């Protein structure tokens, strides 16, 4: 509810919050000060009334008879000490007035005799007067007591409180107005680094993503935001570079088979040919069509796998048994290449069976393309407490260090100059990485050139 009432802009919102907090603080302070002053005035009036009442009791103790009370009017007036807000009256036990100062106003209803030794007090509703009454013993005579009533006129106190309240309200209103102006200026000053950051961000373009925003004279949260923004620009630049390379590689990989198809068709149509010759051209074109088809299927798979995590059919698999099954598919090709495939170790993985097969299949296919004749491809299954690791190793040429970080990128090839379009689509390892990300796992490669290259898949023990 409060968020909906606040302005939408950060500058206006900061200004409004500062004004509201200041107004609330001033209001609470004003109420507290007003209450303190009121309590102080009430305490002072109560003290003066009590002191006057005590003095009157002392002097009445020297009076022999109530008939002597009017004769000592000067003494009773002296007990007020010239206090203009105090008045008093003395009654006998029958309630007859024996003495009263000029400003005394009898309370309505009249104060009854105290039932205890505590003086009775009263403050009639709507009046500015307050009263304090008590019985005082006389020295002798009949009756032996008189009733003293002390009156306090709080008119001046009320006027002081009204003036104080008015002054406080005026000061607080002026303070809120001044605070509003200062808050707006503070918000403008505080957000100036943010405006400079926005102005520089507006100058950014796709060709300048590699240039981070210059360091601003900021600290704290704005410095963190500046670093986060520059980090985002770096990631965007890397994404644009990968996208540009992807587009370039895609165009190159599709151009080669299309160029071959076009050249074969043009040669076939350059002169009349026999049916067998046309058949040879068509059969030759099938390989290129199949390569294009595989490339399109791999690209569609990658596009679908980006949002496929929630659709995985996760179950516990015997990693070694499944690896034996996948390796069996490649036995004929391994025999032709004079390469053997060996599965070792035991492990259990939590994975989608079809995707596990595809990831392992891509790694075995990649190893077959690089393993020398007479060598062995080793599939190792290892179980740990927090993960299961499946690795595929071969003894081919290996991968130099600069290429290992990018080997799983789409269409990335270690040696583009030696790339043969018939050898694959260039998406196999990218598919492996996508499958592992969907399983919450990781993949990587360790290579010692001309000695051993190992691609590994690490599945977490509790995959989603």
Swiss-Prot record:
Domain (Histidine kinase) ranges: 249-463
Reaction catalysis annotation: ATP + protein L-histidine = ADP + protein N-phospho-L-histidine
Statement: the UniProt record of this protein carries the keyword DNA-binding: no
Superkingdom field: Bacteria
PANTHER family documented for this protein: SENSOR HISTIDINE KINASE YKOH, SENSOR PROTEIN
Keyword Signal among UniProt keywords: no
InterPro entries: CztS_silS_copS (IPR006290), HAMP_dom (IPR003660), HATPase_C_sf (IPR036890), His_kinase_dom (IPR005467), HisK_dim/P_dom (IPR003661), HisK_dim/P_sf (IPR036097), Sig_transdc_His_kin-like_C (IPR004358), TCS_sensor_his_kinase (IPR050428)
Transmembrane spans: 14-34, 168-188
Entry EC number(s): 2.7.13.3
Keywords assigned: ATP-binding, Cadmium, Cell inner membrane, Cell membrane, Kinase, Membrane, Nucleotide-binding, Phosphoprotein, Transferase, Transmembrane, Transmembrane helix, Two-component regulatory system, Zinc
Pfam families: HAMP (PF00672), HATPase_c (PF02518), HisKA (PF00512)
Modification sites for Phosphohistidine: 252
Physiological role: Member of the two-component regulatory system IrlR/IrlS. May be involved in invasion of eukaryotic cells and heavy-metal resistance. Probably activates IrlR by phosphorylation.
GO CC annotation terms, alphabetical: plasma membrane
Annotated source species: Burkholderia pseudomallei (strain 1026b)
PROSITE patterns per the UniProt record, alphabetical: HAMP (PS50885), HIS_KIN (PS50109)
Membrane topology: Multi-pass membrane protein
Protein name: Sensor protein IrlS
Principal subcellular localisation of the protein: membrane
Enzyme class: transferase
Localization, UniProt: Cell inner membrane
Recorded GO MF terms: ATP binding; phosphorelay sensor kinase activity
């Amino acid at each position: 509810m409060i968020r909906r009432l606040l302005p939408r802009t950060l500058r206006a919102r900061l200004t409004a919050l500062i004004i509201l907090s200041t107004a609330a603080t001033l209001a609470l302070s004003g109420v507290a000060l007003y209450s303190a002053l009121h309590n102080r005035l009430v305490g002072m009036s109560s003290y003066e009334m009590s002191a006057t009442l005590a003095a009157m009791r002392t002097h009445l103790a020297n009076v022999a008879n109530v008939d002597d009370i009017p004769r000592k009017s000067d003494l009773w007036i002296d007990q007020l000490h010239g206090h203009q807000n105090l008045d008093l009256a003395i009654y006998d036990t029958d309630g007859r007035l024996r003495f009263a100062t000029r400003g005394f106003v009898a309370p309505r209803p009249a104060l009854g005799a105290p039932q205890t030794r505590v003086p009775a007090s009263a403050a009639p509703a709507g009046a500015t007067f307050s009263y304090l009454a008590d019985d005082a013993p006389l020295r002798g005579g009949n009756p032996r007591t008189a009733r003293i009533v002390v009156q306090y006129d709080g008119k001046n106190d009320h006027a002081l409180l009204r003036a104080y309240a008015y002054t406080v309200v005026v000061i607080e209103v002026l303070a809120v107005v001044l605070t509003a102006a200062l808050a707006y200026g503070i918000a403008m000053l505080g957000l100036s680094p943010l405006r400079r950051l926005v102005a520089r961000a507006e100058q950014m373009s796709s060709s300048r993503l590699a240039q981070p925003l210059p360091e601003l004279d900021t600290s704290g949260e704005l410095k963190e935001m500046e670093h986060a923004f520059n980090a985002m620009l770096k990631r965007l630049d890397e994404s644009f570079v990968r996208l540009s390379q992807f587009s370039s590689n895609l165009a190159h990989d599709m151009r080669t088979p299309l160029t071959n198809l076009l050249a074969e068709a043009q040669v076939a149509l350059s002169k009349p040919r026999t049916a067998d010759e046309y058949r040879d051209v068509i059969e030759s074109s099938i390989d290129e069509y199949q390569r294009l088809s595989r490339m399109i299927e791999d690209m569609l798979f990658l596009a679908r796998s980006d949002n496929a995590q929630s659709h995985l059919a996760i179950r516990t698999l015997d990693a070694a048994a499944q690896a034996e099954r996948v390796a069996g598919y490649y036995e004929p090709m391994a025999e032709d290449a004079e390469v053997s495939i060996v599965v070792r170790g035991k492990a259990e993985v939590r994975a989608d069976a079809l995707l596990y097969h595809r990831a392992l299949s891509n790694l075995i296919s990649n190893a077959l393309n690089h393993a020398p004749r007479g060598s062995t491809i080793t599939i190792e299954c290892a179980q740990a407490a927090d993960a299961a690791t499946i690795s595929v190793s071969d003894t081919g040429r290996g991968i130099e260090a600069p290429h290992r970080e990018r080997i799983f990128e789409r269409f990335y090839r270690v040696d583009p100059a030696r790339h043969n379009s018939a050898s694959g689509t260039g998406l196999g390892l990218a598919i492996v990485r996508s499958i592992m990300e969907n399983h919450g796992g990781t993949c990587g490669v360790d290579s010692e050139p001309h000695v051993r290259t190992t691609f590994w898949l690490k599945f977490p023990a509790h995959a989603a």
